[in-house]
Amino acid sequence: MVECIFCAIVEGRAPAEVVFEDGETLAFMDINPANPGHTLVIPKQHVRNIYDLDDEAAAAVMRATVRVARAIKKALQPDGMNLVQSNERAGGQEIFHFHMHIIPRWYGDGLRLARPSEVRRTMAIKEAAAKIRGEIAKEQD
C-alpha cells in the first residue's frame, strides 16, 4: 500500500508549511500552488474523499477552511478566492486523502478552472434535480 503523504504530514513525518491546526484539522501550503497563498485544509483522520467524510469531519474542515480563508484575505488581499475539492481520478483527485483547496485570486492572474467551451448536457436540469432530490430523500428515511 502506498503511504498517504497527508497522513505523514499530520504525523510530523513529512515536512509542510503549516498555517493552522486544531484537534481535527490541519491547513498547510500547497507545494505546487496555483497562486501565492494556495492552501490545503485536511481532516487529520484519513478519509479518502467526500463520499467517506462523516458530518462531524465535514463541519470541522469547513470551519477551518473559513478561518484560513479569512486569514488569507487579510494577509494577501486577493481580489477573490476559489474553494476547490476534487473526488476520484475522473474528478481530478491526485492525493487520496480528502482535502479542500483555498486558492486566492487576483484580477489578471491568468488562472483558469477547467470548464468545457460549450455546455454538454446528458440529461435535463430538472431530471437531474429530481434524481438528486430522490437520493437525499432516501437518506432521511
Where are these regions (language model features)?
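HIT superfamily nucleotide-processing domains
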Residues: M1-D141
